[in-house]
Amino acid sequence: MSNYTATVYRETLETRVEVDLNLSGEGHFTAETGLPFLEHMLAQVARHGLLDLTVKASGDLHIDAHHTVEDIGITLGQALQQALGDKTGLQRYGYAYVPLDEALSRVVLDLSGRPSLHYRVNYPRARIGDFDVDLFQEFFQGLVNHAAMTLHIDNLHGRNAHHIAETIFKAFGRALRVAVEYDPRRKGQLASTKGML
């Protein structure tokens, strides 16, 4: 079983990102990214996933936020992969439905070792403030690829873009919290008949 913590630093010609993650945390979150709305969403993951998360990022925001958002997803995915270790004894699967007023989203995930993102979200507008909502999919794709998880994100209802985004990130945090729980009945076994994830 892993100690559920990881610190990952990633630097490219476009961005510098550092993520500090504790999956056995209390929901604490700090960030310096230059992207306040993304920070607001990541705070939801930390609070509802009961994980402690620090994200520091700088990037070519003078061009746009794409590289920075994607690389935060990549680095968080790498941190998740490290923190989970060999996944012995973990529940492996998690899901959550989260409402916020008129919005309702469902997130289902599998810490399978098989990166796959299924993202079905239609926002009623292209931006929330100055944040391009297309970048949420880029964030999750980067995360999925490097955490090696299967992730299904479905927005079932919603008219308000902020509400839609918030239900997605809250549901992701809650689903992750379930999947990373240690099950003592497994007695050190993986939740797989293959013997590996």
UniProtKB/Swiss-Prot annotation:
Principal subcellular localisation of the protein: cytoplasm
Record keywords, A-Z: Amino-acid biosynthesis, Cytoplasm, Histidine biosynthesis, Lyase
GO CC annotations, alphabetized: cytoplasm
GO terms of biological process kind: L-histidine biosynthetic process
Catalysed conversion reaction: D-erythro-1-(imidazol-4-yl)glycerol 3-phosphate = 3-(imidazol-4-yl)-2-oxopropyl phosphate + H2O
Pathway involvement of the protein, from the record: Amino-acid biosynthesis; L-histidine biosynthesis; L-histidine from 5-phospho-alpha-D-ribose 1-diphosphate: step 6/9
E.C. number: 4.2.1.19
Disulfide bonds: none
Gene Ontology terms for molecular function: imidazoleglycerol-phosphate dehydratase activity
UniProt record similarity statement: Belongs to the imidazoleglycerol-phosphate dehydratase family.
Gene encoding the protein: hisB
Localization, UniProt: Cytoplasm
Protein name (record): Imidazoleglycerol-phosphate dehydratase
HAMAP family: HisB
Gene3D superfamilies in the cross-refs: Imidazole glycerol phosphate dehydratase, domain 1
